[in-house]
Amino acid sequence: LPTGFYTDYDGHGTHVAGIAAGKTYGWAKNAKIYSIKIAGLQGSQDPNSGMPISDIFDIVKEWHKTKSADVLTGVKRPTVINMSWGYFSRYLSITGGNYRGTPWTGNSRVTAYGMTGRFDGAGYRHPVRVASVDADVDELIEAGVIVCIAAGNNYHKIANTSDPDYNNYYTNTFGQTKYYHRGSSPYSSN
């Protein structure tokens, strides 16, 4: 594989892998680690390298299905995939929305209702769901892969379907509706 398919230019993936399976302080010190980089999730130093996400899901699923049992124990070791990433969109201007069933216009209530994301210089970041990614995660779980997913770093409240904030949304100047408290792919709200 080209080095861009597994090189961590930002350091986040390496940091998380160290927590999970570092040789000195990791929780699973004897785990075997494989690094695969997702194309399109660039860190600040990344030259936009990596593999397409759909290919990665297929590779992990097939590898899990065909791997052999541990030679010492005779048991197939678990496959754990860490996905400490997520999808987001940016917005600059809000025209209105809905908070707990009450519609509003303008952007003054966004902050009051706790519906703003983290401003990163280019706009406010908002988590988004990607149905194809969520379906691929379901397939991994059904295949027996243990899936660990990021909770997020942007201080968004995540609500389940019975929470009064689950259907909160805002609309931006492009007419797009963004549900605020549903998390991002892969399944950060489940």
Predicted regions located by residue number:
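Subtilisin-like serine protease catalytic core
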Residues: 1-55, 70-80, 89-93, 142-144
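Low-complexity, compositionally biased segments
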Residues: 11-13, 27, 49, 58-61, ...
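Sec-exported extracytoplasmic/periplasmic mature domains
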Residues: 21-25, 58-66, 86, 138-145, ...
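Short, low-complexity, polar/charged sequence segments that are solvent-exposed and flexible
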Residues: 37-39, 55-59, 100-103, 168
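A Trp-anchored, charged/polar loop motif used as the substrate-binding/catalytic surface
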Residues: 50-72, 127-133, 187
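Substrate-binding/specificity loop regions of serine endopeptidase catalytic domains
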Residues: 87-190
